[in-house]
Amino acid sequence: MDKPRKENEEEPQSAPKTDEERPPVEHSPEKQSPEEQSSEEQSSEEEFFPEELLPELLPEMLLSEERPPQEGLSRKDLFEGRPPMEQPPCGVGKHKLEEGSFKERLARSRPQFRGDIHGRNLSNEEMIQAADELEEMKRVRNKLMIMHWKAKRSRPYPI
C-alpha cells in the first residue's frame, strides 16, 4: 500500500515539472506584425518570381491589370463594336457575299471545275451515265453479299 501512495505523491510533483519544461510559445503568424509578414511574403515571392522575370512570365496578367474592366457588355454590344468584315478570311463564306440563288451560283461555278474530274472533260450526259453505272455496280454487289450471307446460314452445320 505504500507504493500506490508514493506514486500518487510523485504525480503531483511531476505535473509542475511539465509546466516548467514547456518550451516558450512561439508567436503564430497571425500575431506577427504586418511589417514582418510583408517582408516574408516579399522574399517568398522573389524566390518564385524575381522581378526581372515577371514581365516575361506573366505579360498577359500584367496587361490585363492595366486595362479597365469591360463588364456588363452584351453580345450585341460586342458585335456592334467590331468593324464589318469586307472579305471573309481564307475565302470562307464567299457564297454569302455573292448574289443570286444557289442554282445560279452553282451554274456559274460549274465551268471552273469542269476539267477537275480525273483530268477529263465530261458532258452532263456522260457524268449521269457514269453515276448510273456506279449505282448499278453497288446494287449488284449488295445482292451478291446478301446471297452469300443467306447461303452461309441456310446450312444445318457451319462451313
UniProtKB/Swiss-Prot annotation:
Phosphorylation of Ser-38 and Ser-39 is critical for transcriptional repression. InterPro entries: TF_A-like/BEX. It comes from the Eukaryota. Residues 17-34, 64-80 have a biased composition (Basic and acidic residues). Residues 1-97 are annotated as: Disordered. It holds the Pfam family BEX. The keyword DNA-binding does not apply. Keywords: Disease variant, Intellectual disability, Nucleus, Phosphoprotein, Transcription, Transcription regulation. One of its GO terms (cellular component) is nucleoplasm. Residues 37-54 have a biased composition (Acidic residues). Expressed in all tissues examined. Highly expressed in heart, ovary, prostate and skeletal muscle. Moderately expressed in brain, placenta, testis and small intestine. Weakly expressed in lung, liver and spleen. Expressed in several cancer cell lines. The modification Phosphoserine is found at S28, S33, S38, S39, S43, S44. It is found in: Nucleus. Belongs to the TFS-II family. TFA subfamily. May be involved in transcriptional regulation. Modulates various viral and cellular promoters in a promoter context-dependent manner. For example, transcription from the FOS promoter is increased, while Rous sarcoma virus (RSV) long terminal repeat (LTR) promoter activity is repressed. Does not bind DNA directly. It is linked to Hijazi-Reis syndrome: A neurodevelopmental disorder characterized by hypotonia, abnormal gait, developmental delay, intellectual disability especially affecting expressive language, and autistic behavior. Additional features include facial dysmorphism,ocular anomalies, and gastrointestinal issues. Rare patients have seizures. Disease severity is variable. Males tend to be more severely affected than females. This is Transcription elongation factor A protein-like 1. The gene is TCEAL1.
